[in-house]
């Protein structure tokens, strides 16, 4: 499964484009975010990607979860959004 890592400096439109492409190719993807700014950009990207895919009849569903990760040897908690889709 595609895991797209999102930071607070990520462009939401760029992430949305990558997310929409992953959904078209694989029907599912994941976004991983650490920190409030990154989570904000992720949520905006999901909303934008939903708009990109709606004309094709594709609906997105997002399931958030916590995930323990390591960054530079430090334990951190990430928010992971599992994105699935359904064609209607």
Where do the model's predicted regions map?
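C-terminal edge-of-domain segments
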Residues: 54-88
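Low-complexity, interaction-prone regions
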Residues: 1-2, 88
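Short, low-complexity, polar/charged sequence segments that are solvent-exposed and flexible
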Residues: 23-26, 49-53, 80-83
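Short, hydrophobic/π-rich interface segment
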Residues: 36-62
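An N-terminal amphipathic alpha-helical segment
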Residues: 2-29
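Active-site-adjacent beta-strand anchor residues
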Residues: 32-33
């Amino acid at each position: 499964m595609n895991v797209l890592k999102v930071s607070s400096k990520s462009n939401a439109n760029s992430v949305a484009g990558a997310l929409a492409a992953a959904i078209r190719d694989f029907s599912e993807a994941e976004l991983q975010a650490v920190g409030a700014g990154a989570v904000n950009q992720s949520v905006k990207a999901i909303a934008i990607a939903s708009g990109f895919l709606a004309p094709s009849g594709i609906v997105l569903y997002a399931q958030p979860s916590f995930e323990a990760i390591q960054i530079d040897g430090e334990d951190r908690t990430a928010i992971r959004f599992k994105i699935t889709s359904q064609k209607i």
